[in-house]
Amino acid sequence: MEKSDLLLLRRFSAKIKDTFVNPQIWAFGSRVHGTAVPESDLDICVVLDNFNSRDRALVSEIAWEAGFDAGVIISTIVFTREEFENGPPSASRLVQAIRLEGIAA
């Protein structure tokens, strides 16, 4: 992962941790693998104990603000802790890849 992307992940993560209780955050995808092109987005998974549509919108707003400052689009996917650890998404290739290859923030 490029240093600038790691700094962006840390900046995003700090804002999320200031806003939500005990979130888990991982970057994944092409920017983590080093295969990104300049137009690639930064994929980030956020796991919260619980969330509603307002919380999801707030995560997106934080992503937009952090990414805008860096000129990078941050794409987020949000799961509840139960979904991520035990629900149907936990068996998906996406969640498995995030767990194996993602960079925790």
Q: Language-model segments: what does each one mean?
A:
Residues 42-46:
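Short beta-strand->loop micro-motif that forms the acidic, two-metal-ion catalytic signature
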